[in-house]
């Protein structure tokens, strides 16, 4: 689902995360630029059964993106436009919450290669 983005004080920063992020629906577009917040996911148990255990390096594989990759690569999924939550951006948040980040191109490539490698291994393991 979509979400509004609010600041520490509860003031609206963005009315729509999906619009702010220019979110894409396709699998490969999301590998290029992950477009959704994990706190807005709803998924069936069978996806979690495949996703767990998460790949070991949590800096190169966030659980949000991992669950999305498992779901999008092997199952059908739907994005609903309703804003079901307001996502609060704290100054110390780990994720950027859709805002620009300063990670290097090297890190972005390493991150995606790590995710795809583990995704391929998992798909072979579960014969997906």
Briefly describe each language-model feature range.
Residues 22-98:
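Conserved nucleotide-sugar donor-binding catalytic segment
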Residues 14, 76, 100-102:
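Hydrophobic alpha-helical membrane context
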Residues 12-20:
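Short, flexible, mixed-charge acidic loops at enzyme active sites
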Residues 1-13:
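Conserved donor NDP-sugar-binding/catalytic core segment of glycosyltransferases
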Residues 19-31, 87-91, 96-128:
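Catalytic core of nucleotide-sugar-dependent glycosyltransferases
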């Amino acid at each position: 689902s979509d979400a509004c983005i609010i600041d520490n004080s509860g003031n609206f920063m963005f009315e729509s995360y999906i619009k702010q992020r220019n979110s894409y629906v396709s699998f490969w577009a999301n590998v290029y630029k992950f477009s959704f917040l994990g706190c807005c996911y709803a998924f069936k148990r069978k996806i979690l059964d495949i996703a767990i255990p998460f790949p070991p390096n949590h800096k190169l594989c966030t659980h949000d993106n991992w669950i999305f990759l498992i779901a999008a690569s092997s199952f059908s999924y739907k994005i609903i436009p309703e804003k079901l939550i307001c996502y609060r951006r704290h100054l110390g948040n780990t994720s950027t919450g859709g805002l620009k980040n300063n990670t290097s191109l090297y890190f972005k490539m390493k991150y995606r290669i790590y995710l795809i490698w583990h995704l391929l291994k998992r798909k072979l393991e579960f014969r997906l």
